[in-house]
Amino acid sequence: MMKSLLFSAHPTSLLLPAPRLRRLLRLRAASSASASAPPRADRRSPGTPSRRPSSSLYARPSLLDMERDRATRRADVDAFLTSLGVDPGELAGLELPVTVDVMRERAEFLGSLGLTQEDLAAYPLALGCSVRKNMVPVLDYLGKLGVRRDALPDLLRRYPQVLHASVVVDLAPVVKYLQGMDVRPTDVPRVLERYPELLGFKLEGTMSTSVAYLVGIGVGRRQVGSVITRFPEVLGMRVGKIIKPFVEHLEGIGLQRLAIARIIEKKPYVLGFGLQEKVKPNIEALVDIGVRKEALASIVMQYPDVLGLELRDKLVAQQSLFESSILVSREDFGRVLERMPQAISLGRAAVLKHVNFLTACGFMLSQVSKMVVACPQLLALNIDIMRMNFEYFKNEMERDLEELVEFPAFFTYGIESTVRPRHEMVSRKGLTCSLAWLLNCSDAKFDERMKYDTIGVEEMEREDSSDMNASVDEVESEEYEDSDYGDSDDEFVR
C-alpha cells in the first residue's frame, strides 16, 4: 500500500505556505517593483518652498561671500594706511596684505629703519614689500657689504626702490662692477651710501659709457676707481649731455684734454658743477673782474673749485677788500687772481693779519701792495714762518727791505732747506747777488752757478725780471701746513 503511494504517477499537491511566509514574499515583490519603476514626479505645488540643505562644517562660502569679505578687509587696510598719512589710491591695484596686522608689521619695520610717516607717504610702494621676502634679504646683503646702520635712512629715502630689488639679479652685479673698476671692497659701502641710485643702474648703460669716455680723454685706468670712490655720481652722468659739453667748454678756454683729465683725477667732483648754472657764468665773471682770457686756463688748473663757487658777488666783495686794505687797483686785482686764484676765498681777517704783519716789519702800505700783486701767496702763509724768514733776512743776511719788495717770494722758501744753505755758500765764495738769483732756481741750477767766479749783470737782471710764479713752484710744503688759507674738497662735494 505504502509503496504504491510513493511511486504513484499522480501524486497529491503540496501544502500552502504559512501566513508569515506569504507576507515576506509580498514585501520582496513590492521592493523589486519599486526599484525597476521610473522616478515619480514631484507632487509639491509650485508655491511650496523647497527645503534648504542642512549646514555642514565643510560647506564652502560662495564667491559673492568671498568678494564681500575681501572688500571689507581691504577697506580696513585702507583705513590704516590713511591713518599713516598714506593715500590708499597710490596703492590701487597692488596686492596688499589681507589683514591690518600684517600691514602694521611692515610699517613698524620700516619705522625701525629710520623712515618716518612722511617718508612712507612720499613712497608708499615701500609698504608693498614683504618684510621677510623683500626687505630682510636686501638689508642683510647691504649690511654684509658694510653699509652703516645710521646711513640706511638716507639711503632708503633717496632710493627706496632698493627694497623691491633682487639681491642676485640687481644688487650683486653692480657691486661686482664697482670692484672690477678697482673700487676697494672697503670703499664700496661708502660709494653706495653716497650714491644709492647706483643700485638701480644697468651695467650696459650710462655707467660703462661714462667710464669709457673719461679713459678716452686721458684719465688713467688705474685712477678710475679713485674717481668713482670720491665722486660716484659720475656713473650716472650722460656723456653727451653732461660730461662731453663740460670738457669741450674747458678746451674752449685753453685747457688741453690731458690737463682736464688730471683735474678730474684730482678733483672729480668738478664734473658736478653745472655747465650753464655755474661754469659759464663764473668764467664770464672772472673776465669781467679783470682776468685776461689767456690766463683763464691757468686759473682753472690752479684752482678748479673756482668753477663751482658763487663767484660774481664774492669777486666784487674781495676786490673791494683788496682795494681798501692793500691799495690794489681793479686791474692789479686781476693779476692777483691770475697768480693765485685761491685769493678769492681768503677771509677778511686773514688778509688784514698779513697786511698788519708786513707793515709792522717796516714796509709802507704802497710797498705791501706791490709785494702782494707780485706774490699773492704772502696772504696765505703761516705768520710764524714768515716771521722766522724775516728775522733771518734782517739779522743774518743783513739786506735792505727794498730787496724783499722786489722779491717777496723770499717768504715762501724754507730757511733750513733752501735759504740758509745757499746764503752760506754764496757768502763763502764772496759773491754778491740778488735774492731772485739766489733762490729762483733749482738745486741743480744753483750748484752750477756756484762754479762761477763772478755773476754777470745780464744774468742777474734776467733772474730779477723772471716770472714770480716760477719761484712759487719751489715753495716747501711746510710753508702751508698751518696756512690761513684752507682748501678743502668737502666744501665743494655735492
UniProtKB/Swiss-Prot annotation:
Presequence extent in this chain: 1-54
SMART domains in the record: Mterf
Signal peptide: none
Renumbered residue ranges of the record's region Disordered: 32-61, 457-494
Subcellular locations according to the entry: Plastid, Chloroplast stroma
Molecular function via GO: double-stranded DNA binding
Top-level taxon in the UniProt lineage: Eukaryota
A biological process term (GO) from this entry: ribosome biogenesis
Pfam family, one: mTERF
Phenotype upon loss of function: Seedling lethality.
Keywords: Chloroplast, Plastid, Transcription, Transcription regulation, Transcription termination, Transit peptide
Ranges of biased composition (kind: Low complexity): 46-56
Record field: compositional bias (Acidic residues): 457-466, 473-494
Summary of the function given for this chain in its UniProt record: Transcription termination factor required for processing and steady-state levels of plastid transcripts. Required for splicing of the chloroplastic group II intron. Required for the accumulation of 16S and 23S ribosomes.
Family note: Belongs to the mTERF family.
Name this protein carries in UniProt: Transcription termination factor MTERF4, chloroplastic
Species in which this protein is naturally found: Zea mays (Maize)
Biological classification of the source: Eukaryota, Viridiplantae, Streptophyta, Embryophyta, Tracheophyta
